[in-house]
Amino acid sequence: MSYIRSSIFVLIGASCMILSQSCSTCSRQQTLENIVVDLDLADLAADSVYVNMGREVLYALPNPIKVSMLIKKWGVGFQSALLHDPAKASGYLTKKNMAVNFGIYITDLTTAGLYEQTQTVLRYKQALQQLVEGLGLQAAVDQKMMKQLEDNINNRNEMLRIISETYSSCTAFLQAEDRHLYALAMLSGGWIEGMYIAASTIDQKSENLLKQLIADNKPTFDLLWQALSDLDNVPEDAVILLSQMSDLATLMNVATDNATPEMTAKVKNQILLLRSNFIKE
C-alpha cells in the first residue's frame, strides 16, 4: 500500500447516517449518546467521497459504540457470557493476534461501559493495557488516558468518548508507523466482535433484525475488506484471516442481493466462525 492519509481512521459518513436514522425514535439523551464520539456527521459524509483504495485511502472505523447502542436499543440486558474473557489477553503472543483481540476487547469494553458494568470495565481496561504494551502502543495510549477512563467510570458518556478516542488513536498510530496489517487486524476484530454480539443477541429477537443488521453494516465492511485486499506482502499468519474475511465478503454480497433466511444464516455462521478463530490463543 503506497500511501495512506494520516490520521483518517474515522467513521464512514454512510454508517453515521444509518446510526442517526436508527435512533430517530430514541430519547434526546440516547441521541446524545449516539454521537458521544463528538464528530461532525456532515463533515464525515463529505469526507467519504474521497474513498480510494489505490493511492489514497479513507478507512472506515467500525465503531464499537454503534453496534453496542443498537443492541441496547433492542431492550436486551447485559450478557457477559457473550464477551471474550479478559483473562486470556496474556495468551496472545503474535502481533497479529494481539491486534485482532485489541479490537475485540475494546468492543467488549464499550458494551460493558454502555451497560454501566463498572467492575467489568476495569477488567477489560487491564486486558487492553497488556495488549497496548505488547503492540508497543504506549505512545498512542498513555497512562493519563487510562487514568481518565478509570476516573470517569461512573460518567458513561465521557467514558465512551475516551474509549472511542483510544480506539482511533491506536489505529492511527499503527497506520502512521506503516503497520497497516495490525491496524486493519484491530479494526477487523472490533467489527467482528460487534457483529458477533449483535447476531447472537438476535436469537432472542426477530430474524428480520439480522437482515437489517447485515444491510446496515455492509458499507463499513466493504471498505474494511477492500483495504485488507489492498495489503501488500501479507505475512503467513495473516493469510488465513484474509481468506476467512474473503469468504465473509462473498456471503455478505450474496445476502445483500438475496436476503433469504438461509443466506443470512450463512453470514451469521461465518461471523461466528471468524470470531471463534480470532480468539484462539
Model-predicted segments: where are they?
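Bacterial N-terminal signal peptides that target proteins for export
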Residues: 1-10
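Non-transmembrane, amphipathic alpha-helical segments
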Residues: 90-97, 109-116, 120, 148-151, ...
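Extended amphipathic alpha-helical interaction segments
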Residues: 150-231
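A cross-kingdom marker for long, charged
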Residues: 226-281
